[in-house]
Amino acid sequence: MDPNTVSSFQDILMRMSKMQLGSSSEDLNGIITQFESLKLYRDSLGEAVMRMGDLHSLQNRNGKWREQLGQKFEEIRWLIEEVRHRLKITENSFEQITFMQALQLLLEVEQEIRTFSFQLI
């Protein structure tokens, strides 16, 4: 687990929680929740890779882990599109920087999860 990614998650979550986007704050809360969920999933998948013996227990414990992996990639794609949309509509520079960093982090995490999943397959 890359410490820079962990601190990036924490930084972006903190920044997003401070943002005030008026009527769309519910949507922002949804994005924050998705980010937190994605972080937990990424961390657990990374830990499973580090303990390669966990592959069998992961498969036994959850026979649908590949399906869940596909769902996570769908969530990442949704988050990427949502963050891109927010980036296009915001004029606040603080929000623009936050969303640009969030987009970069999502792309990095997507790549990490792909790498982890290939190691587990």
UniProtKB/Swiss-Prot annotation:
Record keyword Transport present: yes
GO CC list: host cell nucleus; virion component
Motif, Nuclear export signal: chain positions: 12-21, 85-94
Keyword annotations of the record: Host nucleus, Host-virus interaction, Transport, Virion
InterPro entries: Flu_NS2
Intracellular or extracellular location(s): Virion; Host nucleus
Pfam families assigned: Flu_NS2
Described purpose of this protein according to its UniProt entry: Mediates the nuclear export of encapsidated genomic RNAs (ribonucleoproteins, RNPs). Acts as an adapter between viral RNPs complexes and the nuclear export machinery of the cell. Possesses no intrinsic RNA-binding activity, but includes a C-terminal M1-binding domain. This domain is believed to allow recognition of RNPs bound to the protein M1.
Subunit structure as annotated in this protein's UniProt entry: Interacts with protein M1. May interact with host nucleoporin RAB/HRB and exportin XPO1/CRM1.
UniProt similarity note: Belongs to the influenza viruses NEP family.
Anything else known: Average number present in a viral particle is estimated to be 130-200 molecules.
Protein name stated in the entry: Nuclear export protein
Gene: NS
